[in-house]
Amino acid sequence: NVLNTPEQQKEMISLMPSGSMKPMLDIGQMVYMDQKIERYLAHGAELSHIHLHDSHPAVHMALGDGDLPICEYLDILESAGYKGMYALEQNDPRYRSNPRQADIQSIRWLKKHGIFD
């Protein structure tokens, strides 16, 4: 990654005159860099995109295959009023032969945990 902290994102965005660049949160990068989600919430309503995936220790896994506290992260985001987009990011080699199955697994996980119907 070129930008590894929310503060670096803020600095880069301040250099862009168009206002079209927005900050994002990559769950895996946040964990890998030993950061807390609250640092990204400092972006406020500008935070508009989140890469959502499970991980162990530094791979992008389908939800439920790793050991991250995904429910805790989603609760924090909901409590903070996050209204942006999520992208499922699951590119671990185990999914290459059937990537659709990883999507289905993550969607089922989200439904099981009441994230959406």
Report residues per predicted region:
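Histidine-acidic metal/acid-base catalytic patches
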Residues: 3-117
